[in-house]
């Protein structure tokens, strides 16, 4: 199963229902997500995130950073779990639904579409889907667009 690339990171999600949903979402990501480097041009990510499976390493690093921040900033467990799911899938459609050579500028917005496409497989509430979609859609800050 695709989610097995993130077994350690999935253990950080304390709620079993949310963890199971994260696994379902990860399994619905395109195969390329689990093979490509984090940056198609190599410009915007550190060297550890380049090369084969770099996007996996990038995602693992982001989860690690979040867990360290959780020691400083206090969130309830549900919020932490939603943040972790968001991080795990934030670049899941980086090259679109079908692989394209370069990153899709609007890739953060595509996750919301994916979640809506598979919501019958999920036990997430509408609010949880919206929160995850919002988290992911804003992960590029001012470099993001929704037009």
What spans do the regions from the language model cover?
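Acidic/His-rich, divalent-metal-binding segments that scaffold phosphate/diphosphate chemistry
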Residues: 1-99
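Histidine-centered active-site/metal-ligand motif
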Residues: 58, 90, 107-108, 139-140
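An active-site-proximal "capping" alpha-helix that borders the catalytic cofactor pocket
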Residues: 62-66, 104-121
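Histidine/acidic-rich helix-loop-helix segments that form or flank divalent-metal centers
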Residues: 83, 122-147
């Amino acid at each position: 199963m695709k989610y097995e690339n993130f077994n350690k990171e999935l253990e950080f999600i304390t709620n079993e229902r949310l963890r199971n949903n994260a696994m379902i979402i990860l399994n619905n990501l395109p195969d390329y997500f689990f093979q490509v480097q984090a940056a198609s041009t190599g410009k915007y990510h550190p060297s550890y995130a380049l090369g084969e499976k770099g996007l996996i390493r990038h995602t693992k690093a982001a989860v690690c950073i979040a867990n360290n921040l959780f020691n400083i900033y206090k969130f309830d467990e549900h919020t932490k779990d939603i943040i972790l799911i968001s991080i795990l899938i934030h670049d899941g459609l980086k090259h679109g639904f079908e692989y394209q050579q370069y990153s899709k500028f609007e890739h953060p917005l595509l996750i919301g579409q994916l979640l809506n496409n598979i919501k019958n497989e999920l036990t997430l509430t509408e609010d949880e889907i919206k929160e995850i979609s919002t988290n992911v859609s804003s992960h590029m800050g001012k470099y993001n667009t929704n037009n």
